[in-house]
A protein has these predicted regions:
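Non-catalytic substrate-recognition/targeting regions of SAM-dependent transferases
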Residues: 94-105, 121-169
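Short, low-complexity, polar/charged sequence segments that are solvent-exposed and flexible
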Residues: 51-52, 61-62, 110-111, 131-134, ...
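Non-catalytic accessory regions of SAM-dependent methyltransferases
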Residues: 1-107, 166-167
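Surface loops and adjacent helix of pleckstrin homology
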Residues: 44, 116, 145
Length: 169
């Protein structure tokens, strides 16, 4: 399925005899291999969910870190600038921008970030650092209070991650 363009791997597609899912913690990055051992990409693991892996990169040399986040944010920015005259839009659409579980809304110099899975939660500081490097924002707010987080075993919270978000934007 991954070779056909899918970005998720279901737990029933994993040979758990060869690679037991319980050996991974939620949010671990791993190299996904085909049955013959050919690397298919880097994935973020959610071993206790039906969707047990989400593709981060087809190149096994590119783990999800600040450098890859900066690159993906720049690509997303380039695409949005073609569509919008003003900087008020959804900058990151999760899997559509190859950042599964991440949504970033831009309101001029203010950014609201939603994280929906453990893989993105693990790199939350790098997400903020990448946003600061690319955009030099006034403020970044984490609005992580969706019900989907509970399904992933994540706590809900809303907090300023960088700067101070005004009451209204």
């Amino acid at each position: 399925r991954l070779r056909a363009g899918h970005l998720w791997v279901y737990s029933n597609e994993i040979d758990v005899a060869a690679t037991p899912l319980h050996g991974f913690a939620a949010g671990d990055q791993a190299i996904l291999e085909a049955a013959g051992g050919k690397p298919l990409g880097i994935v973020a693991m959610s071993p206790n969910n039906l969707i047990c892996a989400r593709l981060l990169s087809r190149d096994v040399k590119h783990v999800l870190d600040k450098s890859l986040l900066v690159h993906r944010l720049n690509v997303a920015l380039s695409l949005r600038e073609r569509l919008f005259d003003k900087p008020f839009y959804r900058l990151v659409y999760g899997e559509s921008d190859l950042l599964p579980g991440l949504v970033v809304d831009r309101f001029g110099d203010y950014f609201v970030v939603q994280i929906a899975n453990p893989g993105m939660e693990r790199v939350r500081d790098a997400i903020v650092e990448a946003l600061v490097q690319v955009f030099k924002p006034q403020a970044v707010l984490f609005k992580n209070d969706s019900g989907a987080r509970k399904l992933e075993g994540l706590d809900s919270y809303v907090e300023d991650a960088y700067g101070v978000m005004p009451e209204t934007v």
